[in-house]
Amino acid sequence: MARVTVEDCLEHVDNRFELVMLSTKRARQLATGGKEPRVAWENDKPTVVALREIAEGIVTPEFIAAEEIVTEDPVFAAFEDENNEAV
């Protein structure tokens, strides 16, 4: 298992704050969202896997934004009108 450094991740992310947000969202997806890792799991924790994905350039802010789009979720349907606008 190779160590993941912040510098490795910052080659693919603009700043440390964005890195924190990106890695948090991805780790949460891996831990609770049922998303599959894009790198070998290697018995690591979700946070380490998320950082490895970012360091390899696999996970980007655009990737996370696409994964977060909720389509036709019945929980949110009650809060929209027929024009698909929030009530």
Swiss-Prot record:
Enzyme Commission number(s): 2.7.7.6
SUPFAM superfamilies: RPB6/omega subunit-like
SMART domains tied to this protein: RNA_pol_Rpb6
Key words, A-Z: DNA-directed RNA polymerase, Nucleotidyltransferase, Transcription, Transferase
GO cellular component entries: DNA-directed RNA polymerase complex
GO terms, biological process: DNA-templated transcription
InterPro entries reported for this sequence: DNA-dir_RNA_pol_omega, Pol_omega/Rpo6/RPB6, RPB6/omega-like_sf
Superkingdom field: Bacteria
Enzyme class: transferase
Single Gene Ontology MF annotation: DNA binding
Sections of the chain in a coiled coil: none
Substrates-to-products reaction catalysed: RNA(n) + a ribonucleoside 5'-triphosphate = RNA(n+1) + diphosphate
Biological role stated in the UniProt entry: Promotes RNA polymerase assembly. Latches the N- and C-terminal regions of the beta' subunit thereby facilitating its interaction with the beta and alpha subunits.
Quaternary assembly: The RNAP catalytic core consists of 2 alpha, 1 beta, 1 beta' and 1 omega subunit. When a sigma factor is associated with the core the holoenzyme is formed, which can initiate transcription.
Family assignment from sequence similarity: Belongs to the RNA polymerase subunit omega family.
PANTHER family for this protein: DNA-DIRECTED RNA POLYMERASE SUBUNIT OMEGA
Protein name: DNA-directed RNA polymerase subunit omega
Organism per entry: Pseudomonas entomophila (strain L48)
Primary gene name: rpoZ
